[in-house]
């Protein structure tokens, strides 16, 4: 899933750049939205991973 969020960010960057160069504000804004969405997904993925690691650590220490 991390690859998907990185891809979405890269795709957004390309769209934003092309939109900027061609003076296409719709494409530029779409790129900004894709980048923001990709960053948000990456943030959520990282939070889930950290929560899972924390839960696993707590479960591992429970029996001690």
Swiss-Prot record:
InterPro entries, alphabetized: CsbD, UPF0337_stress_rsp, YjbJ_sf
Region (Disordered) location: 1-40
Pfam families: CsbD
Residue ranges of coiled coil: none
Superkingdom of the source species: Bacteria
Regions of compositional bias (Basic and acidic residues) in chain numbering: 25-40
Family: Belongs to the UPF0337 (CsbD) family.
PANTHER family: UPF0337 PROTEIN YJBJ
Protein's name according to its UniProt entry: UPF0337 protein SAOUHSC_00845
Organism: Staphylococcus aureus (strain NCTC 8325 / PS 47)
């Amino acid at each position: 899933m991390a690859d998907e969020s990185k891809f979405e960010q890269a795709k957004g960057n390309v769209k934003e750049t092309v939109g900027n160069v061609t003076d296409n504000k719709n494409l530029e804004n779409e790129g900004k939205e894709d980048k923001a969405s990709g960053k948000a997904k990456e943030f959520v993925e990282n939070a889930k991973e950290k929560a899972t690691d924390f839960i696993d650590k707590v479960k591992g220490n429970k029996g001690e």
